[in-house]
Design a protein with these regions (language model features):
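Charged, alpha-helix-enriched surfaces in structured cytosolic catalytic cores
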Residues: 1, 31, 50, 54
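A long amphipathic alpha-helix within ATP-dependent nucleotide-binding catalytic cores
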Residues: 1-25, 153
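Conserved metal-phosphate-binding beta-hairpin within the catalytic cores
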Residues: 15-41
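Catalytic cores of soluble metabolic enzymes centered on carboxylation/carboxyl-transfer
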Residues: 6, 24, 45-236
Length: 236
């Protein structure tokens, strides 16, 4: 019903192209129209993960004057998908934007894990751009599996040198109300104190990891002094 309503809205305004119709869902099962965006949304990979349908390719087909490659009835919906926006911001400081040099970047991968990223190791995060660095999208057979996969992936997302919201996202995923689907649009505000509670201080581990990522520094530390090289191996 909700899909047919969305299609009806697009037909009513004679819209042709990729777009998004947003609704808000009530506890009694009713849904209410919010807005229509005549473009792909940031969250469009969620649809792609669930359906296996390439929305960008279809958008280009329509722009070229062609029709859709598949009928609505032939588009499957499999499993559950979640998207997380990885942002350079400090959740413990009222989501203040963060800047800095990316000293080390190690993005998660594996079955059911997708990362749409715009950053590289050695890059800079400045005030000239939106704080969103990348999108982490996961897919599972059901919601519990998708949440578990999202938690593992976000915990394995390493960005050193810039403060990010990965810890905050993990706290949301770990919250029992989120896992149960028992939340509303007020969830983040109501649970702000819990979700932004400071975690374990691992700054010393991050500094060590950053140092180990510097090949020049590691080579310098591991270099055998000339005097010891000449002596060769010996035992006392």
């Amino acid at each position: 019903e909700i899909c047919e309503t969305a299609a009806g809205i697009a037909r009513a305004v004679k819209y042709r192209g990729a777009g998004t119709v947003e609704f808000i869902y009530a506890q009694d099962g009713a849904f209410y129209f919010l807005e229509m965006n005549t473009r792909l949304q940031v969250e469009h990979p969620v649809t792609e993960m669930v359906t296996g349908f390439d929305l960008v390719a279809e958008q280009l087909r329509i722009a070229a004057g062609e029709g859709l490659s598949t009928a609505q009835a032939d588009i499957p919906q499999n499993g559950h998908s979640i998207e997380l926006r990885i942002c350079a911001e400090d959740a413990t400081a009222d989501f203040r934007p963060a800047i800095g040099d990316i000293l080390l970047l190690d993005e998660p991968s594996g079955p059911g894990v997708r990362v749409d990223s715009g950053i590289l190791s050695g890059g800079k995060v400045t005030t000239g751009f939106d704080p969103m660095l990348s999108k982490l999208i996961v897919h599972g057979a059901d919601r519990p599996e998708a949440i578990a996969r999202a938690r593992q992936a976000v915990r394995n997302y390493v960005i050193l040198g810039v403060t990010t919201n990965t810890g905050y996202l993990d706290a949301i995923l770990a919250h029992p109300d989120f896992a149960a689907g028992n939340f509303s649009t007020s969830f983040l505000g109501e649970q702000a104190q819990t979700l932004t509670a400071p975690g374990e201080d691992v700054s010393h581990l991050l500094i060590a990891a950053a140092a180990l990522s510097d090949e020049r520094l590691v080579a310098e530390v591991m270099q055998i002094p000339e005097m010891h090289r000449k002596m060769g191996e010996w035992r006392n």
